[in-house]
């Protein structure tokens, strides 16, 4: 196999604009100058074409392109023989496929844009893998022959014979109401029309949909839509169940309940596949894990299956021992939560807020007085609908301190690029070198700085919103769900960015967060919200991380232990020996190594 094939050229469809440039890539290419057609592009073309067989990998076109549309990537080892799918010339390609096993839950872990959703489409039979031959795709017989000798051969044979029924819970649940055009639009009508798994009542109980059965789907909130989507899939009989990010929008209690619903679908003959960015939920759900690595929206590679603990640790470590390959320059680590006490001595200013009762329609929130100091992060913990966002808004309205708030839902209305938005809203911070290196650079804002705000994806918008919130000059930062839409890697980076910024600028932050790993990483103290969601809730005064988490987890009836290698929190399986020991001792949350 020639060496040139281990290199791929990617041309971004969004950025490449031959009409607006002088074809610098073609003019500067040394291979074109020798008379070979390595780069073909004319002002009338939609996109440039780069021949990967002729390309010598000099990287001149990458530097010359005025729009930064070209990337030349040297692949690790020779993966050319293992291409599963490629969309078109100079576009994303996926290597290998995850191997589902009957009667077990397969978890997929990897960053955004690395091919997890593509892999799900292929395994569900909704897309035929073209083995990299996008111009001359193979037929199914050839695909099955290609996978011979692996566990996927039997799987694809069933797909070809139409013996397999696959159901996917989509990633973006907020698109569901638009897809439902006619007929009964109520929750119960839509689920009952398809339900054939004899578990309707049980699933309704576990997903807390009993009170919403007569409501129209168009009137559901994000968390309710997520539970509806999980229930709609779980009440149908199928051979393959696929859940794409089943925990977004849900609070910690609902995440664990959803996890139990998904695990209840297992039978000896069916397959369950889950894509999840909340690592503690993925850990709780899966029996084994495939890690995906590569360069987002350029290429993705699926590893062999690992045990859950080993797979997640490999992803965090950035190094695959079986392939002797490092795919990330540094490991993602967790500090121990009690190591935060080093900075307590420096805290000077103390602020207090009074007892207060807020009533909004049927909902009543009783706030107990409390206080906070500077250089401190307080995480608000509680179920959805217990008034965490209401508390943030009340703080913003009734305090003399300057407050910057990142709302829970981000609806962009700004006409223009990200750069224009930053220069308009947070000019001083954006032009400050320290803010650039501590906030913008780690959140990789550079990659999207010249894109239109209205065209950004959920994760990109979230990163822009975090930058905007931290860039405003304020005494108190209220950040509502900073982890939504971010992948596991970005979540850890975002929590490090927020923590470093708050401590260095000696400000206070109140953060609402449902991702357990992120909440424990960020919190110095916690405020617990208890009571009946949407009816009557109570906001307790701030308490230490250990006592707060212990009380919170006791209400959820869940215990956590720490992984000895990476120190990340792991959920104990319900009623396991460890679970019972910790409950008897009253230790629901562990801090020691």
Swiss-Prot record:
Sequence positions that bind ATP: 110-117, 382-389
Key words, A-Z: ATP-binding, Cytoplasm, Initiation factor, Nucleotide-binding, Nucleus, Protein biosynthesis, Repeat, Ribosome biogenesis, rRNA processing, Transport
Question: Which GO terms are recorded in the biological process aspect for this UniProt protein?
Answer: cytoplasmic translational initiation; ribosomal large subunit biogenesis; rRNA processing; translational initiation; translational termination
Residue ranges occupied by any ABC transporter domain in the UniProt entry = 70-318, 334-556
Q: Which gene name does the record give? A: rli1
- Give the multimer and partner information: Component of the multifactor complex (MFC). The complex associates with pre-initiation complexes.
What GO cellular component term, any one, is given? nucleus
As for family, the record states:
Belongs to the ABC transporter superfamily.
- Name of this protein: Translation initiation factor rli1
Q: Give a short account of what the protein does.
A: Component of the multifactor complex (MFC) involved in translation initiation. Required for the binding of MFC to the 40S ribosome. Required for the processing and nuclear export of the 60S and 40S ribosomal subunits.
Q: Which InterPro entries match?
A: 4Fe4S_Fe-S-bd (IPR017896), 4Fe4S_Fe_S_CS (IPR017900), AAA+_ATPase (IPR003593), ABC_transporter-like_ATP-bd (IPR003439), ABC_transporter-like_CS (IPR017871), P-loop_NTPase (IPR027417), RLI1 (IPR013283), RLI_dom_1 (IPR034348)
Which SUPFAM superfamilies does the annotation name?
4Fe-4S ferredoxins, P-loop containing nucleoside triphosphate hydrolases
* Subcellular location per the Swiss-Prot or TrEMBL entry: Cytoplasm; Nucleus
Work out whether the entry's keyword set contains Nucleotide-binding: yes
The record, for Gene3D superfamilies, names: P-loop containing nucleotide triphosphate hydrolases
Q: Entry's NCBIfam families?
A: PRK13409.1
Task: Please name the source species.
Answer: Schizosaccharomyces pombe (strain 972 / ATCC 24843) (Fission yeast)
Question: What residues does the 4Fe-4S ferredoxin-type domain cover?
Answer: 7-39, 46-75
């Amino acid at each position: 196999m020639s060496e040139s094939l281990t290199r791929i050229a990617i041309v971004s469809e969004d950025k490449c604009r031959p009409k607006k440039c002088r074809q610098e890539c073609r003019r500067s290419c040394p291979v074109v100058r020798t008379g070979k057609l390595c780069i073909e592009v004319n002002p009338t073309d939609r996109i440039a074409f780069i021949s990967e067989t002729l390309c010598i990998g000099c990287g001149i076109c990458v530097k010359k392109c005025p729009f930064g549309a070209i990337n030349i990537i040297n692949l690790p080892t020779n993966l050319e023989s293992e291409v599963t799918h490629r969309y078109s010339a100079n576009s994303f390609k996926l290597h290998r496929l995850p191997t589902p096993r009957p009667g077990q839950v397969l978890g997929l872990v990897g960053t955004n844009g690395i091919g997890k959703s593509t892999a799900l489409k292929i395994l569900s039979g909704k897309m035929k893998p073209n083995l990299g031959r996008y111009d001359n795709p193979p037929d199914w017989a050839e695909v099955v022959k290609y996978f011979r000798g692996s566990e996927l051969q039997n799987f694809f044979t069933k797909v070809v014979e139409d013996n397999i029924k696959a159901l996917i819970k989509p990633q973006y649940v907020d698109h569901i109401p638009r897809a439902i055009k006619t007929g009964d639009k109520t929750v119960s009508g839509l689920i009952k029309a398809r339900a054939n798994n004899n578990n309707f009542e049980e699933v309704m109980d576990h997903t807390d949909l009993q009170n919403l059965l007569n409501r129209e789907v168009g009137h559901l909130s994000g968390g309710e839509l997520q539970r509806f989507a999980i229930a709609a899939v779980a009440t149908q009989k199928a051979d393959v169940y696929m859940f794409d990010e089943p925990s977004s929008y849900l609070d910690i209690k609902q995440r664990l309940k959803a996890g139990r619903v998904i695990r209840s679908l297992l039978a000896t003959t069916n397959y369950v596949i889950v894509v999840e960015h909340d690592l503690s939920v993925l850990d709780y759900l899966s029996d084994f894990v495939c890690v995906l690595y590569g360069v987002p929206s350029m290429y993705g590679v699926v590893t062999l299956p690992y045990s859950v603990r080993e797979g997640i640790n490999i992803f965090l470590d950035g190094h695959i021992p079986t392939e002797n390959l490092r795919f990330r320059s540094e490991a993602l680590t967790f500090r121990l939560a009690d190591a935060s006490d080093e900075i307590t001595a420096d805290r000077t200013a103390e602020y207090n807020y009074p007892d207060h009762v807020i009533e909004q329609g049927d909902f009543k929130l009783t706030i107990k007085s409390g206080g906070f100091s500077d250089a401190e992060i307080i995480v608000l913990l509680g179920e959805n609908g217990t008034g965490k966002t209401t508390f943030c808004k009340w703080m913003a309205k009734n305090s003399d301190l300057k407050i910057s708030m990142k709302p829970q839902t981000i609806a962009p209305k700004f006409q223009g690029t990200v750069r224009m938005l930053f220069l308009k809203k947070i000019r001083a911070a954006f032009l400050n070198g320290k803010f650039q290196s501590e906030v913008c650079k780690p959140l990789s804002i550079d990659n999207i700085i010249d894109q239109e705000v209205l065209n950004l994806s959920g994760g990109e918008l979230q990163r822009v919103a975090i930058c905007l919130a931290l860039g405003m000059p304020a005494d108190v930062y209220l950040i509502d769900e900073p982890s939504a839409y971010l992948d596991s890697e970005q979540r850890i980076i975002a929590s490090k960015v927020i923590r470093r910024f708050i401590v260095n600028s000696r400000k206070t932050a109140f953060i609402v967060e449902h991702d357990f790993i992120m909440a424990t990483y960020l919190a110095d103290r916690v405020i617990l919200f208890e009571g009946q969601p949407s009816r009557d809730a109570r906001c307790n005064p701030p308490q230490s991380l250990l006592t707060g988490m212990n009380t919170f987890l006791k209400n959820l009836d869940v215990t956590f232990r720490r992984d000895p290698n990476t120190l990340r929190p792991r959920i104990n399986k319900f009623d396991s020996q460890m679970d019972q020991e910790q409950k008897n001792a009253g230790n629901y949350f562990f801090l020691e190594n």
